[in-house]
């Protein structure tokens, strides 16, 4: 019996539903006999051949293009057969079933044409590409990220990762760590030599440069992770502060009902927008007030869901009504809401209705301009006239830590950020040991090894089976 990752696999590679074209993909070793049975003739490598796809009796299931990519010059690194038919789900299912049937039939040589052919698991074609060194792990993840990209910037960043930009930078850092570790090991292995390998190699300077490059790569990875994951933003505040109007202004569409009646919004409403290519998932919530003030049970449930959304948010836009901020009770309620927010949430105070209270708006704007470093960000705007909306967009990106031009960013995942952070921690520790006497060289070497291993996890040079299963299990079937 073949190992699982050597078994031939087949799947419909195009998305479910109706379309002009659908693709059935087969990957394995030795597909010539299967291809001949399906199309009735030998296929020339890497040349599209048009004709019928045949059932067991020789009748046509459909007509389309067949392509054979012999190993190793294919997506998976194995022999690959692609059948491009009309994109109806029934046709594609019939074609896939015929592939499985024909694989088990006895060929002219007296043996099954492709024994063991089975349906592919999600992501298994890309997993084969990784296992056969066609892609590293970061590139394999970029395939899924390119498919899932929700903005143009995210798609272009994923394409850069798929082309190997991210991996090349990781490899360059790993090579530097290996070279420096070799010098440390040489000093440990040949203590009798009158050569200070580390001093001659400028170990301190190398470590400083490695730390600097790691810091830059970590910052870029954070930008890439933000492009991939997006920013989850909750609009919160008291009833009638203008939350739904702000959602409409940010989205550029009338998504939420706006009335002067308190409690109009009973449940959360969400919309994904783009700000400089960054996906921002904006959630409008029910107005926050005490259970005693809530009009009925439905509103109380809506308020509870608002707090739940806040707990899961990356940032909160806390709305203040400029026409009522001078009222002690209203101001006290705003303060109570702010104090209840999670300590680690990105908070932006949004002072709304500047068009209705221009003098108060000017006073608040002056106060915000004089705020100290570390104070929560604040914006004065009018959701009705859209004045100040651009400033709010900029404040949101700044709060999220976005400062890069999308053209220079590669897509990244949270696990990449964690690995880079771990590597940076180990390099910092190595710098500390390098300042010590020669008795600390073994500890220096260990920190360099740990930093290298952390980076190796990104490209898959060192990966656990559990990690691989989690990554490829998130792909669609047929990819």
Swiss-Prot record:
GO terms for molecular function: GTP binding; GTPase activity; metal ion binding. GTP binds at residues 240-245, 259-265, 284-287, 352-355, 382-384. This is tRNA modification GTPase MnmE. Keywords: Cytoplasm, GTP-binding, Hydrolase, Magnesium, Metal-binding, Nucleotide-binding, Potassium, tRNA processing. Exhibits a very high intrinsic GTPase hydrolysis rate. Involved in the addition of a carboxymethylaminomethyl (cmnm) group at the wobble position (U34) of certain tRNAs, forming tRNA-cmnm(5)s(2)U34. Homodimer. Heterotetramer of two MnmE and two MnmG subunits. Gene3D superfamilies: P-loop containing nucleotide triphosphate hydrolases, Probable tRNA modification gtpase trme, domain 1, tRNA modification GTPase MnmE domain 2. The keyword Translocase does not apply. One of its GO terms (cellular component) is cytosol. Mg(2+) binds at residues 244, 265. It comes from Leptothrix cholodnii (strain ATCC 51168 / LMG 8142 / SP-6). Belongs to the TRAFAC class TrmE-Era-EngA-EngB-Septin-like GTPase superfamily. TrmE GTPase family. One of its GO terms (biological process) is tRNA wobble uridine modification. It is found in: Cytoplasm. K(+) binds at residues 240, 259, 261, 264. Its main location: cytoplasm. Residues 230-401 form the TrmE-type G domain. Its EC number is 3.6.-.-.
